[in-house]
Amino acid sequence: MTTPPSTPGEVDLGAYEAWLFDMDGVLTKTALVHAAAWKEAFDAFLKEESARTGKTYAPFDPESDYEKYVDGEPRADGVRNFLAARGITLPEGEDSDPPTAATVCGVGNRKNDLVLAVMKKQGVQDYEGVTELIAALKSRGVKVAVVSASENTVAALTAAGINQLFDARVDGHTVKDLHLAGKPAPDSFLQAAKDLGVDASRAVVLEDALAGVEAGRAGHFGLVIGVDHHDEGDSHAYADQLHEHGANVVVRELTELVSH
């Protein structure tokens, strides 16, 4: 297919060999959980930093800062990105650092502990249309993979009851083990396509993050679908951004892809 479709109604579910799904904000309603956990972890650190240095305390914004610095990024990269924007550099530390440690790993571990606690208490909900879309794809012989920077991918998908649906998984552990660059680099999506034995031009990327659709474009995937779950008032502006950053098609719900 030389010209990708530009509207949901033009998407042929059987036209590509594989679909590669981001997790947070596409498959599962965990993006808000992650944003809140990042805020609590960063704000605790920033308050400590303010008390230590006398700098004005400015809290983490769970919308703009989340989207700009941490959404779709491996945990350590998210810590580095945000703190660099605040002019703060921390020692890397070790994976085993306690959540109170003033290191990249320590701040990341604090955030991770918060996410796991919320998932354990509240569970994880998948978005409407996930199981229907994947069933429709599989009925056409299409392979599906989940691609996420989260090291909690299996836990989140299992909690949502959809872990068994995927033919391949590239997650935060894969990224770390294979030294893959984070989004907007296309490495994680390219690895998923490789694991499925499919050329990037014959695969679809589904992403809600701007860095994610950029990764889809950078990897020369056959089709990049942006998923915009923003409220109606914010939707058009974000949909435009998704298009600008590389999405061929933008949907508000996955049901739009199976309802035609």
Listing of model-derived features with the role each one plays in the protein:
Residues 249-256:
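Short acidic-hydrophobic, aromatic-tinged amphipathic segments that line or gate anion-handling sites
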Residues 131-135, 209-212, 224-238:
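Short glycine/proline-centered loop/turn elements that form peptide/ligand docking sites
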Residues 4-5, 9-23, 27-128, 139:
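N-terminal helical cap/lid subdomain that shapes the substrate entry/recognition surface
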Residues 142, 151-204, 210, 214, ...:
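Substrate-recognition "cap/lid" segment bordering the active-site pocket of phosphatases
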